[in-house]
Swiss-Prot record:
An individual GO BP term: glutamyl-tRNA aminoacylation
Single GO MF descriptor: glutamate-tRNA ligase activity
One CC-aspect GO term: cytosol
Family to which this protein belongs: Belongs to the class-I aminoacyl-tRNA synthetase family. Glutamate--tRNA ligase type 1 subfamily.
The protein's name: Glutamate--tRNA ligase
Gene from which this protein is expressed: gltX
Quaternary assembly: Monomer.
Organism: Stenotrophomonas maltophilia (strain R551-3)
InterPro entries hit by this protein: aa-tRNA-synth_I_cd-bd, aa-tRNA-synth_I_codon-bd_sub2, aa-tRNA-synth_I_CS, aa_tRNA-synth_I_cd-bd_sf, Glu-tRNA-ligase_bac/mito, Glu/Gln-tRNA-synth, Glu/Gln-tRNA-synth_Ib_cat-dom, GluQ/Sye
A Pfam family matched in the record: Anticodon_2
Reaction it catalyzes: tRNA(Glu) + L-glutamate + ATP = L-glutamyl-tRNA(Glu) + AMP + diphosphate
EC number: 6.1.1.17
Main location: cytoplasm
Length: 467
């Protein structure tokens, strides 16, 4: 049987980090087993579902590179199918119409609580065989088995058993003509041939009800794997402030999608002591049965370390589009400066995020207007104009402007003046960047471009002369 998994977000907000991990695990399980991954949008909550949230989810999935074989499939396009299955259950004696008012339902729950019983529907209409009629309170309820136990072997948590006496006859079709969540997902999983349901353990209480529904409609019951939640660094539930952010905020913060996926994979799954995984390694090694049954803690410092590794090792061409995004976010004209590939090569060893890389690269994409006073005082002393002037002379004469050629010219400058390289590099670094901290001097000068480099050296020579 072909493995088929699904990621089924409700479009009531952005895709947060926990949802991204769920999507990743579903995607990896399907890819590892040579199966198929389905994206389903569970949008039957018409009051809370928005097109903006749908767009945000699709954008995040695309950025993460989690491609799907089918979808997006929208539940709101399938309401007629849900009604067809619900009415068949009624015809088969497995479900029934009920018409209690809100006040009557509240009275049932209050009576149960007065007896110190679990508040729930008491099955008043279960055996009445009421016909369908126009009524603002009309619902369809599923006849949950009265005896027995629901037993399933969770792929992550192990065997779980729930007595049917703990469950009531749940509503499967609401008065507004829409299915309930538990019913719609079961019909969807049946129609879409889903074989494995991987989701957060906040859904675990739904599983016994859903298993009874699968069996009630004659559908095969998929395997279930419920992942524990992700906690913040203090062990508390994640909040927006502590990391439960929109996935696209991680993009804005300068994380590479492959780095985020590698980190998320380890938040609940492991393969020995290995900490870093390429996308292909994850596909080859992932098995949902290896997931941890205990909650994981988000560690932003660890994520930074992982991202730094990917910046150092990933193909330059793969990093460039993400750097361009960061440069444009800063309002920079990418065409007005060095090739982004060259910026990646120069800075990839010196930063943790692409945002930091872009901020350090600003000096090469716009005019230099500010100088660090301490750097000027230290390196624009009398005599510095000699090194600057000789460097300008040799740089201007270069037949070809490359980082290597620039490096040779600067070493020739030091040799011609019989001084250490630092005496040439530091004044030149301040001249080009306005600070005394930058990548190696050959890349620093090269990235400015010949015309800008010569102009900035001229300004620096004037500053030294007038100091």
């Amino acid at each position: 049987m072909t493995c088929r998994t699904r990621f089924a977000p409700s479009p009531t907000g952005y895709l947060h980090i926990g949802g991204a991990r769920t999507a990743l695990y579903c995607w990896l399980e399907a890819r590892h087993r040579g199966g198929e991954f389905v994206l389903r949008i569970e949008d039957t909550d018409r009051e809370r579902s928005t097109q903006g949230a749908i767009d945000a989810i699709l954008e995040a999935m695309e950025w993460l590179g989690l491609d799907y074989d089918e979808g997006p499939i929208y539940q709101t396009d399938r309401v007629a199918r849900y009604l067809e299955v619900a009415e068949q259950l009624v015809a088969d004696g497995k479900a029934y119409y009920a018409y209690e008012t809100r006040e009557e339902l509240d009275a049932m729950r209050e009576a149960a609580m007065a007896k110190q019983e679990k508040p729930r529907y008491n099955g008043a209409a279960r055996e009445l065989g009421l016909p369908r009629k126009d009524d603002p309170n009309r619902v369809i309820r599923f006849k949950n088995p009265l005896q027995g136990t629901v037993v399933f072997d969770d792929l992550i948590k192990g065997r779980i058993e729930i007595a049917n006496s703990e469950l009531d006859d749940m509503v499967i079709f609401r008065p507004d003509g829409f299915p309930t969540y538990n019913f719609a997902v079961v019909v969807d999983d049946w129609d879409m041939g889903i074989t494995e349901v991987i989701r957060g353990d906040d859904h675990i209480n739904n599983t016994p009800r859903q298993i009874n529904l699968y069996e009630g409609i004659g559908a095969p019951v998929p395997k279930f794997g419920h992942m524990p939640m992700i906690l913040d660094e203090q062990g508390a539930k994640l909040s927006k402030r502590t990391g439960a952010a929109d996935v696209m905020q991680y993009k804005d913060a300068g994380y590479l999608p492959d780095a985020l996926l590698s980190y998320l994979a380890r938040l609940g799954w492991s393969h020995g002591d290995q900490e870093l995984f390429s996308r292909q390694e994850l596909i080859e090694l992932f098995d949902v049965k290896d997931c941890n049954s205990k909650a994981s803690r988000l560690d932003m410092a660890k994520l930074g370390w992982v991202n730094q590794h990917f910046l150092k090792t990933e193909d330059v061409a793969a990093i460039v589009p993400h750097l361009v995004y960061q440069l444009q976010k800063l309002g920079l004209d990418v065409a007005a400066g060095p090739a982004p590939e060259d910026v990646v090569i120069a800075l990839r060893e010196r930063v943790q995020t692409l945002k930091e890389m872009a901020e350090k690269a600003v000096v090469w994409y716009q005019p230099l207007t500010e100088y660090d006073e301490a750097a000027v005082a230290k390196h624009f002393k009398a005599g510095a104009e000699v090194a600057l002037g000789k460097a300008r002379e040799l740089l201007a004469a270069l037949p070809e402007w490359t980082a290597e050629a620039v490096g040779v010219a600067l070493h020739d400058t030091a040799a011609a003046l019989e001084m250490g390289m630092g005496k040439v590099a530091q004044p030149l670094r301040v001249a080009i960047t306005g600070t005394q901290v930058s990548p190696d001097i050959s890349h620093t000068v090269y990235l400015a471009g010949r015309d800008q480099a010569l102009k900035r050296i001229d300004v620096a020579i004037t500053k030294v002369a007038t100091a």
